[in-house]
């Protein structure tokens, strides 16, 4: 899995802004690691694609608050999954195609 540099020209302005906003909110809520997966990570996204995020480290009591804040800030569909709850082929696919947005060192 590679680290995605959000300062490059991978995404158009509004999508980049939305991804940065989501990552910032999740960091604020205690995320230890944030992974972008799905069409945005693969590069085959459309203008209306949702933001698929896999996260580690957000306490259960903060999860829904973080999700609500992400939805309000971005005005686009956001899917946030806890990496600890993902298994099998889906987990392997995220590890293979995912791009690390943030990792607490």
Per-region residue spans from a language model:
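Catalytic core of pol beta-like nucleotidyltransferases
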Residues: 1-32, 42-47, 56-105
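Glycine-rich beta-strand-to-loop/alpha-helix junction loops that act as flexible
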Residues: 37-39
């Amino acid at each position: 899995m590679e680290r995605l540099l959000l300062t490059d020209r991978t995404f158009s302005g509004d999508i980049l802004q939305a991804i940065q906003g989501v990552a910032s909110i999740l960091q604020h809520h205690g995320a230890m690691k944030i992974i972008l997966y799905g069409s945005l990570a693969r590069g085959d996204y459309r203008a209306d694609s949702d933001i698929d995020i896999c996260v580690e480290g957000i306490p259960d009591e903060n999860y829904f608050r973080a999700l609500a804040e992400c939805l309000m800030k971005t005005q686009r569909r956001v899917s946030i999954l806890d990496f600890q709850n993902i298994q099998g082929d889906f987990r392997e696919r995220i590890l293979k195609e995912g791009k690390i947005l943030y990792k607490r060192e």
